Amino acid sequence: MRERIIRSGDVELWTQAIGEPDAPALLLNAGDCQSSMDWPEDLVRLLADAGHLVLRYDYRDTGRSTHREFPPNPYDFDDLARDAVAVLDGWGIERAHSLGFGMGSAVSQLLALDHRERLTAITLLGSCAMDVDFFGNWERALTGEPTLDGLPTPERWFVELAFNPASVSEIEFYRRLSGDQLPFDESELQQRIDRVRAHAADEEPVEDHPHGQIRQDWTKRAADLAGITTPALVIEAPLDPIHPPPHARHLAESIPGARLTTIPGMGHYLAPAIHQPLTDAVTAHVGAGM
């Protein structure tokens, strides 16, 4: 493992490379409010052993990257996409496969729209298409108002917990995100939580994380998805409470030539049971996109 601090404008990003230096690069873009250490170690190892140079990094305001107050220093998903490009530049990587989970899928979609020359492929999981009024749907989940597109809102229990995270333990929150069809390894999650906290030893917990304050209207880019030429794979998680089916299918249908793969039993959580199926899907897609 090699570590490197990389500058993106006036922000410093902590980054790490795992795998053979000359292997095809795989850039990991995590979920919102998550650092590089939120990627399960077993999954990272499997991806590296499968022949990828895995690049993971701390978003701004996470881990060991630059932390600043958001209102005086606002940014949006376009800035996060530019940060991702800076990571590639910092490691001397011309092109990479971008794997995005949750918010990282939005970053990957923007990379495919605005920086397609830097990509070999994208894999999207735990996300929705850009024509979905995601932030408005949180309110609709609470009021019962129908969505603008007929697609489902996040499940009400998730929105209620997201607005009141102290009502359950962190482990219980992730247990619910994972769903009830796959084994839930509490000890593995606790180790991951401990690793995240140790990695960000100087980070003070905040109630309103900057990522949660981004309110960029990405629906303005919805029509642009039809212009994506980067080979795309969408992973469907049948038990995802944030983007329930058929969101993944709708996302795949919004991108020309995109393939859809379902991982049975998966929720909005990278449970140990999905690490090998996800690695297999990503590896096969990288081969198809090269």
What are these model-derived regions, one by one?
Residues 11-67:
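Conserved HGGG/HGGXW glycine-rich cap/lid loop of the alpha/beta-hydrolase fold
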Residues 32, 238-240, 265-267:
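Acidic beta-to-alpha connecting loop that harbors the catalytic carboxylate
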Residues 78-96:
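Conserved acidic catalytic loop of the alpha/beta-hydrolase fold
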Residues 94-137:
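Conserved hydrolase catalytic core segment
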Residues 139-223, 230, 250:
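Alpha/beta-hydrolase
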Residues 228, 234-236:
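Short beta-strand/loop motif that positions the catalytic acidic residue
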Residues 241-247:
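Conserved alpha/beta-hydrolase "acid-adjacent" motif
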Residues 257-290:
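Catalytic active-site module of serine/aspartate enzymes centered on a nucleophile-bearing elbow/loop
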